[in-house]
Amino acid sequence: MEPVMSLALAAHGPPSILEPLFKTVTTSTTTTTTTTTSTTTTTASPAGYSPGYPGTTLLTALFENLTSTAASGLYDPYSGMYGNQTNGTIGFETKGPRYSLASMVVMGFVAAILSTVTVAGNVMVMISFKIDKQLQTISNYFLFSLAIADFAIGAISMPLFAVTTILGYWPLGPIVCDTWLALDYLASNASVLNLLIISFDRYFSVTRPLTYRAKRTTNRAAVMIGAAWGISLLLWPPWIYSWPYIEGKRTVPKDECYIQFIETNQYITFGTALAAFYFPVTIMCFLYWRIWRETKKRQKDLPNLQAGKKDSSKRSNSSDENTVVNHASGGLLAFAQVGGNDHDTWRRPRSESSPDAESVYMTNMVIDSGYHGMHSRKSSIKSTNTIKKSYTCFGSIKEWCIAWWHSGREDSDDFAYEQEEPSDLGYATPVTIETPLQSSVSRCTSMNVMRDNYSMGGSVSGVRPPSILLSDVSPTPLPRPPLASISQLQEMSAVTASTTANVNTSGNGNGAINNNNNASHNGNGAVNGNGAGNGSGIGLGTTGNATHRDSRTLPVINRINSRSVSQDSVYTILIRLPSDGASSNAANGGGGGPGAGAAASASLSMQGDCAPSIKMIHEDGPTTTAAAAPLASAAATRRPLPSRDSEFSLPLGRRMSHAQHDARLLNAKVIPKQLGKAGGGAAGGGVGGAHALMNARNAAKKKKKSQEKRQESKAAKTLSAILLSFIITWTPYNILVLIKPLTTCSDCIPTELWDFFYALCYINSTINPMCYALCNATFRRTYVRILTCKWHTRNREGMVRGVYN
């Protein structure tokens, strides 16, 4: 049995154990006397066994084969030896804990807190991205990728680093060491590249908002994120695993864990440090500097880009004549025109919303000064079979901008409906070039007045009574008419009122409004399917049994005139509606002969002469003047518009669902409430109202500038904090990486300093969720939902406010 035991020991132990048994085998192995003595106590040769034993030759050959095989075995780079040879310089017994027990407890507690905060913060970022649809944007895709990298650092890298730092040595062996280093450097480098991608994304979004955002798709974002992880995967893990085989041996001791080529090859060290840190941080600094410079430039140029400057190439609501309609004491049409460069300073972009700048809404009146109206907006874009006229470059650009602006609006379905209608169905409500309605403003039909040489007869002084426009489709471009001045507008209003009175009081049944059951309606009055008269001071009325004469029965020249509407001659007015008594008389005039309807219309016309025909509607409630009382009453009692299927349906092509719920009319113009109130005071109070207007304007301008400065300052501070935190946490370690290969002294840099700077890089993963996510209000609200376990609830109020404001 003893030879068998010796053979087993020889297979698993050092070859020196066999020396007491067979002195002839000890040719290549030497041991000390102490070792042989302790070994021979358990392996003593029995009696009768001697070096001349017959079995000695066989055993000698066997053991020589075993020892030669072990000596010529494959090289193991992780053990640093061939076969079962041992290296006395590498072992776990050489090092122990470097810190006291109290220090180890404190370090473990701090490391556990940092790791938990890092993991929790990045998990909240990923959950927020998942449960809130508002956060699923292109920019937040980059944040999601960054959160994945930081989560890996907090879950894997930080705990293992804390273990090796507290114990003072690496206890898990070389294979786990290389795996930990590969994952650690992969996640850290991916985190840096994700920061770089975010920097590029913000830079292009600021400097190239139009071209870049068109290419900024989810697929491109996925490609960029994949590139960040792919570069990190190629840069670190392959070299960490393969470097001991490249050099032929592993120089890292078993009780330590670091990348071998950082100490053995200074060229690789410099290259990886430049590629992993110095190049990205340099690019990030440059990009953020450009972003900061562009922000400052825009902040400096902001007064020139505001709506106060007249720039028709960028604004669709600019017109050739900017007038503000106010209430005058006894005038038919009173316009308070603000002169100088301050007349547009109250205008605000559509994207801005402020509680200090509320709005009032006013309808639009279109005036054709005796010429063929200019072609409409859609015909200038879609009509290809018509004769082209020569237009100015400014006019063409203006037309294109208007069509482009309306192409993405919510009422684009109205345009499709208008295309279905024939172009010769008459008039439709024209779309003006004023500021489009916000999405929260309901569309209602408006009354639009047009003056031209319409009919061959039945007019006074060559001017026909104003009509309701039923179509703005004009397939034939016509010359641009001259603009109607304010004096012409006032003269037109006076002539219109007198014409309406004369025509309607004739009593012969041939006027614009006729109560005869056999009379036909020529389009000069408003036809209500319910038989109620909704007239105004400009001669609007109805008959109970009147029939609508389609414009196709008119002469061709008149239809051509009727289809064209001038978009430049646009003035904002409100058509006065009749009182309840007048409406009742007009509705009941069918049985009283021609004189009854004429008298009712005449009374409406006279009422329009006595009261102001232009009135500003304030959003905070009805006006308190006595003249405006009938207007408010009529607007409150106005009946719903006829449907498309009724006998007197009008091809307005507008959504009628909001007409009976909102008294604000179609194509309303949005102006600040301060200007409306101050403008009314200026018309009635003279210099005092003008001073009030200027004070309100200056106060709003100062407050807006202060808000913009605060926003720009906050954005600049956020960008600076992000860049500063990255530089502070990553620079010290990367400086040591470049310094250590250059120094011949291995102990010049203390181990504690290495560990501290290495841990500082991890802290950047803890700061990233705070810098990127907590600066976003939507992230903060989602964090609160997660912490309060409200996973499936939504902030409806915030969503509605974000969509409709």
Curated annotation (Swiss-Prot):
Cross-referenced InterPro entries: GPCR_Rhodpsn, GPCR_Rhodpsn_7TM, Musac_Ach_rcpt
GO molecular function terms noted in the UniProt entry: G protein-coupled acetylcholine receptor activity; G protein-coupled amine receptor activity
Keyword list, A-Z: Cell membrane, G-protein coupled receptor, Glycoprotein, Membrane, Phosphoprotein, Postsynaptic cell membrane, Receptor, Synapse, Transducer, Transmembrane, Transmembrane helix
Ranges of compositional bias, category Basic and acidic residues: 308-318, 341-353
Glycosylation sites: N65, N84, N87
Summary of the tissues where the protein is detected: Intense staining in the glomeruli of the antennal lobes, the region of the nervous system containing terminals of antennal olfactory sensory neurons and mechanosensory neurons. Also a discrete group of neurosecretory cells in the pars intercerebralis of the brain.
Record localization: Cell membrane; Postsynaptic cell membrane
Function: The muscarinic acetylcholine receptor mediates various cellular responses, including inhibition of adenylate cyclase, breakdown of phosphoinositides and modulation of potassium channels through the action of G proteins. Primary transducing effect is Pi turnover. May have a role in the processing of olfactory and mechanosensory signals; regulation of neurosecretion.
Protein family (similarity comment): Belongs to the G-protein coupled receptor 1 family. Muscarinic acetylcholine receptor subfamily.
Protein's name in the database: Muscarinic acetylcholine receptor DM1
Organism field: Drosophila melanogaster (Fruit fly)
